Amino acid sequence: MNTQLINNQWQAGQGPAFASINPSNGETIWQGNGASAEQVNSAIKAARAAQLQWADTPLEQRITILENFAAQLKEHSEEFAVIIAQETGKPLWETRTEVGAMTGKVAISVKAYNERTGTTENPMPGAKAFIRHKPHGVVAIFGPYNFPGHLPNGHIVPAILAGNTVVFKPSELTPHVAQFTLSLWLKAGLPAGVINLVQGEIETGKALAAHQDIDGLFFTGSSNTGHLLHKQFAGHPGKILALEMGGNNPLIIKDVNDVSAAVHDIIQSGFITSGQRCTCARRVFIENSSNGDAILAKLISATKNIVVDDSFATEQPFMGAMISEKAALGMVAAQNELVAKGAEVLVELKQLKPGTGFVSPGIIDVTNVNDMPDEEHFGPLIKIYRYSDFDSAINEANNTSFGLSAGLLADSENDYNHFLKRIRAGIVNWNRPITGASSAAPFGGIGASGNHRASAYYAADYCAYPVASVESDKVTLPQTLAPGLIIE
């Protein structure tokens, strides 16, 4: 199978064979060979050869091609949603929203480019001052598996818009989505070499990240991989590195009158996408009060009733399969480890079908666990903390090396204002699920969740660098020379 796109030419990979498995049924839906180091090098060379001409292409023409891409997404939206569902196990209703987000990214990126990295002009005595922005050059983009279309798209669209060329390395778990995405870019009329695709596993990624001729790398994925990339780039200050990693995200509930609404937002925060969003609530803090008891009781009941089923079930489920059986078994193991530390299972997370990624959502009370690991358990397992003091709950919420998302469900605006001042996270929501983030706002975290390169609306910032200029249309001798200077 031709799995690599280099200089607008599809070709077979020359590296190790790998396959993509539908986590809902264990069937192989894609197979091919990864890119060799030589093919990675060829992709970077193609991107380098195309970069200057692409940067010189008028902005209006670049925008037209991006709009063509958005039109292709609309035209093929259902086919694309089906491919994402097959490869990730997510319900079809959710993958349809992912394709919609990809389509909307184009207009948002154009707006962000003009607002944040366009050209500004200011008068000054005898000259004009300009601020312009230039592309970095050739950038590598690493994509994750949980949103294999939308999240890499959030790097690719603004990077190409700014005049960069791209070498894209998707997750080895979602190669079919990547291949389909690139086919739409070709249909949109993107010139040869502007975007290149190198598929493969860890060796392909290493060859791309270590290549001397990339000018930057944009990454969305696990904290462990992000930290390795950060160390690797530490000796290369001339290369731009944008990291969007995970989180051990807290959600605090305090004095909420509408118990059902609170339970809804907890479930949306913890279990959407089978808990495989980097913004999902991992830790939920519930008051030691009658209100807290009522919320927890209803949460337990509602969690037991969550429908988990195939992506294409006629009656659509809330949760589909996790990305793989390995991921599902990893969540079962994480739950067992917490039980061994003294946690109490309130709703057991179980693998529902051997050979698949299907698990039931779980709730576990960790209030009495003294040595809680600061880990992102990337799946549908909510850890409950009961608290009596609001400030102590906030302090414990901040007791993490991560800092991606956080939220408060509370009827009091004063409580929220206090929470907002004290909590450490890049995304902070009030009375909304903490998985809710807008593409028209920055998306990023602090601490182990990123390196201060927020994506989404602020992706424009890391896709181009500023150039400051003072300009005059002719050389002019000042009427008054500086002291000690004589020009005759």
UniProtKB/Swiss-Prot annotation:
Write out the GO MF terms.
succinylglutamate-semialdehyde dehydrogenase activity
Which species is this record about? Pseudoalteromonas translucida (strain TAC 125)
Keyword Manganese listed? The answer is no
- EC number in record: 1.2.1.71
Coiled coil regions in record: none
Q: What does this protein do?
A: Catalyzes the NAD-dependent reduction of succinylglutamate semialdehyde into succinylglutamate.
Gene Ontology BP terms? arginine catabolic process to glutamate; arginine catabolic process to succinate
The entry's active site is 244, 278
- In this chain, NAD(+) is annotated as bound at 221-226
Q: Which gene encodes it?
A: astD2
Keyword NAD assigned to the entry: answer is yes
Similarity remark: Belongs to the aldehyde dehydrogenase family. AstD subfamily.
PROSITE patterns reported in the protein's UniProt record: ALDEHYDE_DEHYDR_CYS, ALDEHYDE_DEHYDR_GLU
UniProt-listed InterPro entries: Ald_DH/histidinol_DH, Ald_DH_C, Ald_DH_CS_CYS, Ald_DH_CS_GLU, Ald_DH_N, Aldehyde_DH_dom, SuccinylGlu_semiald_DH_AstD
- Name of protein: N-succinylglutamate 5-semialdehyde dehydrogenase 2
**Disulphide bonds in the chain:** none
Q: Which reaction does it catalyse?
A: N-succinyl-L-glutamate 5-semialdehyde + NAD(+) + H2O = N-succinyl-L-glutamate + NADH + 2 H(+)
Which Gene3D superfamilies does the record match to this protein? Aldehyde Dehydrogenase, Chain A, domain 1, Aldehyde Dehydrogenase, Chain A, domain 2
Q: In which pathway does it act?
A: Amino-acid degradation; L-arginine degradation via AST pathway; L-glutamate and succinate from L-arginine: step 4/5
Instruction: Name the UniProt key words of this record, in alphabetical order.
Output: Arginine metabolism, NAD, Oxidoreductase
